[in-house]
Amino acid sequence: LNTTTLESPFGELTLQRRPRRRNEVLQAWDAADRYLLNYLAENPPPKGSRLLLVNDAFGCLAAALSDYECISWSDSAVAHRACLENCAANQRNAPALLSSCEAPTGSFDRIIYRLPRNHSYLRYQLQHIAQLLRSPDVFIGACMAKYLDSSSMAVFSESIGEAAASLAWKKARLIHLQSLSPGAAVDDDSLALDSSELGISLNNRANVFSRGKLDRGSRLLLNALGDLHTPYSLADLGCGNGLLGIMAGKRWPETALHFFDESYMAIDSARHNVRDNLPGAAAQFYARDCMHGYDGAPFDTIVC
């Protein structure tokens, strides 16, 4: 299995996943990406079109469609980094990058959508996309068939309009909009988490991990904080909503706190939760691939 070379209607591409692993057995694209590219080759956007690429995992779509004006909208800092790396490696024009916490604006000739598995995030994105559509045929979505269920189609119906799935090709399906819902609104995507037992308030954006409950790993680590010596500088790696760092800050008010996550929505949630629970705290926030690119002082404690 060739894990790096994609033969597409838009040319041959050499693509790599991130994080990099020796003897990689997974590809930086899947059949849903190929299905989308085949569809776009058969139904090409006009030359000079402006395209919104949503949830392009490793930049496969951006590299293939680089002759167009592309904007990559994603919640993943890792995806954005991989996109830039793969475009550079193939000498393709890189897209403009837009984080999930920013709403895309302007007119788009095509909106090319990879469905996320998280229904809260799906709803959030579709509600924003609905504000951009002037006709159903501007939108084309895709996912692997095993991730498409009646609940996902119901979110389409509630958020943007009636949708239909294509026949499967290599276990992938395209999603076409058949109609647009009039007056579709954008809801507040934040969800308050019941954290009264901890004496703090937490709000989570749509794509934050375990946003509706306190996960087991966090409970375990919270219990372990009491065994640590007072840190001078602490990193909350994969911080999610910032719970561990916040509880560390309440225990050790003089500790410098650093929050890392690859999810823009996680970092946004952590920033707001720190502001609400630790006003005036010395905290820094980083949306990136682990600690890649961090060149500050070393940490004496890392929670993860």
Could you say what each language-model-derived stretch is?
Residues 2-34, 56:
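N-terminal, charge-rich interaction modules
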Residues 2-5, 117-195:
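N-terminal auxiliary segments of SAM/dcSAM-dependent transferases
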Residues 21-30, 35-42, 168-231:
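SAM-dependent Rossmann-like transferase core, predominantly class I methyltransferases
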Residues 96-99, 140, 166, 203, ...:
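General small-molecule cofactor/ligand-binding pocket signal
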Residues 111-112, 302-304:
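Hydrophobic beta-strand segment of the Class I
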